[in-house]
Design a protein with these regions (language model features):
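Trp- and S/T/G-rich repeat-edge/linker motifs of beta-rich repeat architectures
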Residues: 1-6, 22-45, 65-88, 110-134, ...
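Short beta-strand motif characteristic of blades in beta-propeller domains
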Residues: 3, 7-24, 50-64, 91-109, ...
Length: 238
């Protein structure tokens, strides 16, 4: 974990396999989620995390180990079921206000998505499945901004992200996972780097220094972040 409390700036980031615009992190808007920090420190590892602005949180360790706080019941039921079936959690996302969520898992070698989302997003997911596409990441907010990532590199997104998604692929290759904030910003983890339209400067500081290409980057509009290699190494500020 790196202390981001005193940091804040606006700048373009173009270094260490990361590209995009950093916006000033304001520490006066930060309310800690101590549970998530305690859980990661106790386990000494974290593979994926998802969290809201109001304190809802979930951390995944290993294939399907988990710690959670105030998860929506539907999301918790999915996590418990994957754990019971000894599956693997592929990606998780919770919207900043905690009203929408997604869980992508692999159970018995089959990729499965579960989500609480808008009808438009459900229609996109079902259409991709009908084309034989497997979903590996679904990120969204309460305003129906979204990015869907398939295992073959196919993406679907709301119109506002089309340019960002195209530029991310051109610069860093296949998109692996996504994050969308309440303000309609997105972060895209790719084969060769991380591309974003806007990211809090607290997270940008880590991306400029981390010694691996992140597999997951989760952020909120107000500066919380989780950045990991998809295995055991992570940086976080909750």
């Amino acid at each position: 974990m790196m202390d981001a409390r005193m940091r804040g700036y606006n700048a373009t980031v173009n270094e260490n396999h990361s590209y995009g615009r950093a916006i000033r992190y304001d520490p006066t808007l930060h309310t800690p989620i101590g549970f998530l920090t305690d859980a990661i420190q106790k386990a000494n590892e974290a593979r994926i995390a998802a969290f809201s602005r109001n304190g809802i949180g979930l951390v995944i360790m290993g294939n399907n180990g988990y710690y959670y706080y105030q998860l929506p019941q539907g999301m918790l039921d999915v996590i418990l079921d994957v754990n019971k079936k000894e599956g693997r959690i592929i990606d998780i996302n919770i919207t900043e206000y905690g009203k929408r969520w997604s869980v992508i898992s692999r159970v018995n070698n089959k990729l499965i998505w579960n989500a609480l989302a808008s009808d438009d997003i459900y229609n996109k997911l079902n259409a991709l499945n009908s084309q034989g596409k497997d979903i590996v990441s679904l990120a969204m907010n309460e305003y129906s901004d979204y990015v869907i990532v398939c295992d073959d590199g196919t993406t679907e997104c709301s119109p506002k992200f089309e340019s960002t998604v195209r530029q991310a692929k051109n610069k860093f290759g296949k998109i692996l996972s996504a994050c969308v904030t309440a303000l309609g910003n997105c972060v895209l983890c790719c084969d060769r780097g991380v591309y974003f339209n806007y990211i809090p400067s607290s997270a940008a500081d880590i991306l400029k220094k981390v010694d691996y290409i992140p597999r997951y980057v989760k952020v909120t509009s107000y500066g919380r972040y989780f950045i990991s290699d998809g295995n055991t190494r992570s940086y976080y500020w909750f």
